[in-house]
Amino acid sequence: MQLSGVFLQLGEERLPLLLRGVSIGKLKTYQLYERFKTRTHLAKVNTENLRKASPRFWSRLNDQDEEFATDLSQAILISHMDMVAAVLNFIGVPNEEGFFAKDPDPKQHLTEGWQTRAWERFKDEYPQPLLLFYINHLDWELGGAQQAWLPAAA
């Protein structure tokens, strides 16, 4: 599965919820703002423009624009590094404030049922669409997931 497939399998209704959490300040801090602005074809990146662009973004994901999917996922996740670090710490993946540490094989830490354990631990602490996206992104990135993981009641 490609990264665009993670978005697609989670459903169009979750995309606006993910976009709502994008932090312009964090994009600028991590020097991703200009790249993201260029990739999204927005004259200015703000919450209103992101909300309005959601249908266009969905179309690009449907077209399997992987560079766009990568930049979009970076913008979403960099805006929530506290959650990323918390999940990685919980499942035992070595990291430095949410960024992978120099572990030769971080996927060894993704033991059977890690998705369910992470979901149950954090579903009431972070926005559920965001947590669900990160669990699936991590599974795609490290575990090579071919199918999106969904909790029983999501």
Regions found by a protein language model. Name each.
Residues 21-146:
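Acidic, low-complexity, intrinsically disordered interaction modules
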Residues 11, 147-148:
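Aromatic-enriched hydrophobic runs in primary sequence
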Residues 1, 150-154:
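Short intrinsically disordered terminal tails
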Residues 1-33:
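Short terminal alpha-helical segments
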